[in-house]
Regions:
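N-terminal presequence-like segments and the immediate start of the first folded domain
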Residues: 1-58, 62-75, 81-130
Length: 130
């Protein structure tokens, strides 16, 4: 099986040795995104779970678009929250606006102790190539 590695100019610059996405076996595995600004990754992440969730999902959209995909192609999502109890409901409200009600992917959400760049939410996903 061959793999295709995607480094995309419109997505936030990687801060470690990874690809934005790797395509293999008809699936596209998208690296976890934080609420960083793709135009200037030196800027701090926005305050609050709503703003961070929007920015993370917008960054994921950039990666998907760069791979010729959209949220309708997503089949699995993993979400990491630094304060699960405080942020879960608000994150869900924003998250739900990015996926059609009849095309919501499988999902796992977990609480973690810390994320890079003092982020409070990180999301990665798997999409399928139609």
């Amino acid at each position: 099986m061959q793999a295709m590695f995607h480094l995309l100019p419109d997505a936030p610059k990687p801060v470690a040795p990874y690809s934005h996405a790797v395509e293999a076996g008809g699936f596209v595995f998208v690296t976890g995104q934080l609420a960083t600004d793709p135009a200037d990754d030196s800027l701090p992440v926005p305050d609050g779970i709503e703003a961070q969730t929007r920015k993370v999902l917008d960054n994921l959209r950039r990666v998907l678009t760069g791979c010729g995909l959209a949220f309708d192609h997503v089949v699995c999502v993993r979400i990491f929250l630094t304060d699960f109890k405080r942020d879960y409901a608000a994150m869900n409200a924003i998250y739900a606006t990015y996926f059609a009600a009849d095309r919501r992917p499988a999902r796992t959400t977990v609480g973690v102790t810390q994320l890079a760049r003092d982020g409070i939410v990180e999301i990665d996903l798997i999409a399928v190539r139609p």
